[in-house]
């Protein structure tokens, strides 16, 4: 990192900004409401397209999204089948 040789605080900040990532646990990208029926997971305007993953969760959970996704998928699959 140029210009950071004598200032470690600047170096760590620049490193963080350059290499930090979200971990790819996206949620809420298709939040229940206007696009998806909250009771069935059915996408409005389609006959057979369901969303049952973390994209329908309106707020990001504190932990890993895996358990939340299992619950959402399980509950909505019971309603679908």
Swiss-Prot record:
InterPro entries found in the cross-reference section: FAD/NAD-bd_sf, GMC_OxRdtase, GMC_OxRtase_C
Superkingdom of the source species: Viruses
A molecular-function term among this protein's GO annotations: oxidoreductase activity, acting on CH-OH group of donors
Database matches in Pfam families: GMC_oxred_C
Intrachain S-S bonds: none
PANTHER family xref list: CHOLINE DEHYDROGENASE, MITOCHONDRIAL, GLUCOSE-METHANOL-CHOLINE GMC OXIDOREDUCTASE
Protein family membership: Belongs to the GMC oxidoreductase family.
Protein name: Putative truncated GMC-type inactive oxidoreductase R833
Originating species: Acanthamoeba polyphaga mimivirus (APMV)
């Amino acid at each position: 990192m140029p210009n950071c040789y004598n200032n470690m605080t600047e170096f760590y900040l620049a490193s963080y900004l350059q290499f930090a990532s979200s971990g790819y646990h996206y949620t809420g990208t298709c939040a229940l409401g206007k696009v998806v029926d909250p009771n069935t997971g059915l996408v409005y305007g389609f006959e057979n397209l369901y969303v049952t993953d973390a994209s329908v969760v309106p707020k990001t959970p504190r932990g890993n999204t895996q358990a939340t996704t299992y619950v959402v998928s399980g509950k909505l699959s019971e309603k679908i089948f």
